[in-house]
Amino acid sequence: MWVLASKTLSSVPFPFLYNPIPNRHSSSSKLKLNSSVKFEYETERGLDFETGESFFRHESATGRDLGVLAAALYKKSKARLRILDGLCGCGIRSLRYLVEAEADFVLANDANDDCRDVICRNLSKVPRGSDDEPRWTVTHTDANRVMTECYLQREFFDLIDIDSFGSDSSFLRPAINALRFDGLLYLTSTDGYSSGGHRPHHSLAAYGAYVRPLPYSNEIGLRMLIGGAVREASVLGLRVVPLFSYYSYHGPVFRVMLRVNRGKLSDNSHYSFVSYCHQCGNSQTFHGMNSVRLVAPVAMQSPLSSRGRFGQDLFTTPPILQKC
Ligand SMILES: C[S@@+](CC[C@H](N)C(=O)[O-])C[C@H]1O[C@@H](n2cnc3c(N)ncnc32)[C@H](O)[C@@H]1O
């Protein structure tokens, strides 16, 4: 598993794009025509677009870069690319998937229908195609509903991008269902409280990981997210392989790109316990569901069981995913 640090990439222009917004809106500018209509313009990797009143953070550009890179590689190897951008905001990801990854089709969805005009204006830089074979479509429904309807109609996607707030793991099952075998699932969590171990019951409910405060909470946040997806997929008889993970301090934001395939995990070695001693700083991983038996004598004999935080937790909690 790669863990990448945040870094801003330089802009790469796309001169072939129709650009209805002159260059005076260089990187981020606001133009208020009246109190009710607000236009905000941004530029990312050479693409100009509007954000309007939608939720947009330019700090997330690297996360979008990585999604686009994975999508472009997928298109190269499979010669097809259908994408569902489930929580698209102003539609910048959808636009970048269409332009940079040359997606054949993007379904851009955001529950907030106030974003519709902005999304449509942004995507209209790419010709929409015919009614029978559109390049892009915009919808405004709960992402779970869109994905479930696609699944029921057997309209599967090569890449599903879930750019959600907090630790909303309710998207996992519908997203996995609507994904083609060997497809890519790009997930997000912004729940720093859970990864920091401050809401163990919440992380347990969301991802099946009882997380306590650890000095490497950023890594734990990524593993927590991967672990939740692994568990959901395994219920459906599917296997998840992490391709990359990315932590960014703004938010904080945890992103993981997963490949989902047929076939169960070969054994339970992907489930582990992580122990950490707050006194000596020693950290240890116990692999497999037999960990409890392995850990018991260790914890009984060491100061962990009486003074360390994790000696007892090891016996009482489900595992957090440790090995990918
Ligand atoms: C983090 S923002 C998306 C940002 C966008 N992907 C980008 O890269 O700029 C999350 C978006 O999800 C939308 N949203 C929240 N709950 C949703 C749901 N259940 N289904 C679909 N969209 C939802 C919000 O309106 C918001 O625009």
List the model feature ranges, each with a label:
Residues 2-324:
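SAM-dependent transferase fold signal centered on methyltransferase-like domains
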